[in-house]
Amino acid sequence: MSNTRHTEISVAYTNSRTKKTYSLDDRVEEITITDNAVGEGDTVDITVMDKDRKMVYDYYPGVDDMVKCTVSLYGMDGGKTGVVGNQTFHIDQFSYNDFASKMTLRGIAVPKNSTFAKTPKTKTWKNTTLNNIAWFTCHDYGLPYYRESGAFNPHIEKVEQSNATDLSFLFNISQTYGNGMKIFSDRLVIFSEEEYEKKAAVRTITHSDITDGSFSARFDLIRQYTGYEYEHDVGDVHWTRSHYFITKPEIKISIGQCESQTDGELKGRAKVNLANRDMQMVTFEIIGDPKMISTATFNLSGYGGLDGKYYINKVTNKFTASNGFTQEIEARKIQQRL
């Protein structure tokens, strides 16, 4: 092993037709792993050389194929400094180019043959909690579920799942109460984005860290909303309540009918925070750093008014045989929460 910074990749491809696992390490030309903080499952695209045409004969993809992909980084002393990826994906499509003898495999973190993400359902949930809804839903698919301690777990008197897939319903109800939801390595996790925003920055990013010409920013100068309004009943009395965290301008969002004052405040805060969350966005490319993952925070320095603490929404990890390992970072400046 050379005593220089370098990257090593491992791609273990399990073929459902042959019931065997093959190493594609020596064939890999490019790997792109997309790491999303919330909403979407992680994905991978792997381009492999196929001069011996094994990918279209011996290794020809089957409907239940899986791939485990890992990018390992090593420092000047030859010691491992970090790992990116290291999760299993379900292959859901491939493309082939005969002229260059290349195949690109696309993998997704969400089980592809499951009705979890594909089949709309209608169901009424009563007298339950977010945690129970998530647990029972995931249990139906044999999908491991974990709720982090900081995530809200409200009591829910009644909620309708109306012609929605279980995946979209869980995501929307999690978001309704200010939580984030992520699927990776066949696990579903509900967590508090606010708690992750409070964590210490993993590093400081300056001009010298960023690939020339890759930095861009979009900043909205006016908040979408500065407060909320909701309605609820106490006995025969109908209440309309509102709350602002910035007095001027008064721009409120209507939450509608809620179960209680507590329910209205939880939903109101979550909706205002979500609407204002992406007011200030940056994107840029850096040399790969295993600490820069979705949900991590970093400090931006040397950009004047853009400086501050940022939360990573999305990381596109890219390895090529010619250029090594790079990352495209999409991040939002952390805003004052209601």
How should these model regions be labeled?
Residues 1-27, 151-155, 233-261:
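Extended boundary segments
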Residues 2, 102-105, 109-113, 147-215:
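Short beta-strand-centered interaction patches in the first periplasmic/extracellular domains
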Residues 113-119:
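Acidic/histidine-rich, surface-exposed loop or edge segments in extracytoplasmic proteins
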Residues 81-96, 194-197, 311-322:
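Short, compositionally biased
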Residues 71-73, 192, 302:
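Conserved "cap/hinge" positions at secondary-structure junctions
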Residues 1-112:
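Assembly/oligomerization scaffold segments
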Residues 45-47, 107, 121-146, 161-184, ...:
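Amphipathic, non-transmembrane alpha-helical segments in extracytoplasmic/periplasmic proteins
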Residues 31-62, 210-338:
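An acidic/polar, Gly/Ser/Thr-rich interaction patch typically located in mid-to-C-terminal regions
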